[in-house]
Swiss-Prot record:
InterPro entries: PPIase_dom_sf (IPR046357), PPIase_FKBP_dom (IPR001179), SlpA/SlyD-like_ins_sf (IPR048261). GO terms for molecular function: peptidyl-prolyl cis-trans isomerase activity. Reversibly inhibited by Ni(2+) ions. Its EC number is 5.2.1.8. It comes from Escherichia coli (strain K12). Residues 2-72 form the PPIase FKBP-type domain. The keyword Hydrolase does not apply. GO terms for cellular component: cytosol. The keyword Isomerase applies. This is FKBP-type 16 kDa peptidyl-prolyl cis-trans isomerase.
């Protein structure tokens, strides 16, 4: 077990993620279940990993990440247009609804219904927090915890 967070550590944390307007987007404290972050496996943004490096058990840190260091900037390439006929099996979509779509490789990806205009439905596949500055409040609970098999 390492004494501080390293570039390949697994870290058990409590965190709260807030937006610029102060609303909480996500918090592990709400359900009392901490999150396991794995550094170095590309599941976290580089900006987030940089803020975790060197922290020790019991450390608390608060920091902000600009969009390009967090969930990215919205890409127009990730906005797709579908015919209403393609939604017949799923039922009538509603603006703001998040639906799962099957990608060409068979994986599923969430998309947000942004607009319904006649026979055309606009779906946004950008991360819901893309383009947002996010504010983290993180407490390190454990580094490289022994995981149950």
């Amino acid at each position: 077990m390492s004494e501080s967070v390293q570039s390949n550590s697994a870290v058990l944390v409590h965190f709260t993620l807030k937006l610029d307007d102060g609303t909480t987007a996500e918090s592990t404290r709400n359900n009392g279940k901490p999150a396991l972050f794995r550094l170095g496996d590309a599941s976290l943004s580089e900006g987030l990993e940089q803020h975790l490096l060197g922290l020790k058990v019991g450390d608390k840190t608060t920091f902000s990440l600009e969009p390009d260091a967090a969930f990215g900037v919205p890409s127009p390439d990730l906005i797709q247009y579908f015919s209403r006929r393609e939604f017949m099996d799923a039922g009538e979509p509603e603006i703001g609804a998040i639906m799962l779509f099957t990608a060409m490789d068979g994986s599923e990806m969430p998309g947000v219904i942004r607009e319904i205009n006649g026979d055309s439905i606009t779906v946004d596949f950008n991360h819901p927090l893309a383009g947002q500055t996010v504010h983290f409040d993180i407490e390190v609970l454990e580094i490289d915890p022994a995981l149950e098999a």
